[in-house]
From Swiss-Prot:
Gene responsible for this protein: pdxJ
GO biological process: pyridoxine biosynthetic process
Subcellular location: Cytoplasm
Function: Catalyzes the complicated ring closure reaction between the two acyclic compounds 1-deoxy-D-xylulose-5-phosphate (DXP) and 3-amino-2-oxopropyl phosphate (1-amino-acetone-3-phosphate or AAP) to form pyridoxine 5'-phosphate (PNP) and inorganic phosphate.
Main location: cytoplasm
Record-stated family: Belongs to the PNP synthase family.
Subunit structure: Homooctamer; tetramer of dimers.
Family annotation (InterPro entries): Aldolase_TIM (IPR013785), PyrdxlP_synth_PdxJ (IPR004569), Pyridoxine-5'_phos_synth (IPR036130)
Organism: Rhodopseudomonas palustris (strain BisB18)
Name this polypeptide is given: Pyridoxine 5'-phosphate synthase
Origin organism lineage: Bacteria, Pseudomonadati, Pseudomonadota, Alphaproteobacteria, Hyphomicrobiales
Keyword Methyltransferase in annotation: no
Catalytic reaction list: 3-amino-2-oxopropyl phosphate + 1-deoxy-D-xylulose 5-phosphate = pyridoxine 5'-phosphate + phosphate + 2 H2O + H(+)
Amino acid sequence: MSKALPLRLGVNVDHVATLRNARGGKHPDPVRAALAAIEAGADGITAHLREDRRHIRDADMARLKAEISKPLNFEMAATPDMVQIALATKPHAVCLVPERREEVTTEGGLDVIGHHNTLAPFIARFNDAGIRTSLFIAADPAQIEMAAELHAPVIEIHTGAWCDAVEAGNAVKAEAEWQRIVAGAKLAQSVGLEVHGGHGLDYATAQTISALPQIAELNIGFHLMGEALFVGLTESIRRMRAAMARGRQALEATA
C-alpha cells in the first residue's frame, strides 16, 4: 500500500462571488470569506476567474493574492489572456480547466490530449515562473499519461460523475466511477504526478476519497457554502475537515 500523503483542504470561494453579483455591490465579499475559511482551517483558497467574469472578478483575484496568508489556487481556462493575468497575479498554483460560456459549472475534464500543443507552452511558462500547474482532468489513463508528458506537476481528478451517481443513488455507476478514480490516482502517482480531487464533493464523498493514500488535496466549494447557510462557514469547514480526517483514519486502520 502507498504511504498516505498529508491531506490538504482548499476552499473555493466562487459561490460567495456568485451571491454578491446576483444583486451587485460589494457584499458578500469573497475575500472576507477566504479569510474566514483560513481561520476555520482551510489550507488554501481556490478561485476561478472565468472569461465571462460571472463570479470572481479580476479585482477579487488581486485582493486574494494580496490579503490571504495561505496558497492561492487560480482556476482558469487555458487562453493567452488568462495566462497573462495569472503570470501577473503570481498565485501559488494555477489549475487549468475547460470552460464553456453556456455551462452552469465546469462540466467535464480538460482534454489534455487534444489540446497538448496549446497547453505545453503555457505549462512551461508557469513552471519557469515558479507557479505550480494543475490539470483538471477525468480519471482516464491516456489523459493522465499525457499530463505527465506535458510536465505538469499536479492533476486534479474530476470527481463530479462519481459524486452525481452517489447522490442519485445509482450504485452501479457510482462504483464504476469510483474504480476509475482509484485506478487513476494510482497511475498518476506512479508517473510522478501529485494528485488532487474536486467537483461535487460533500461530507460523505470527501470522507470516502480521503481514504485514497495518493490524494494530497481536495478542493471543495459549493457544498461548504451551501452548508454554511445553515451552520455557518466555520462549522461547515470544521465538519469537512472532520470527514477528511475520518477517511484518513480508515486508511491508517487498514494499513
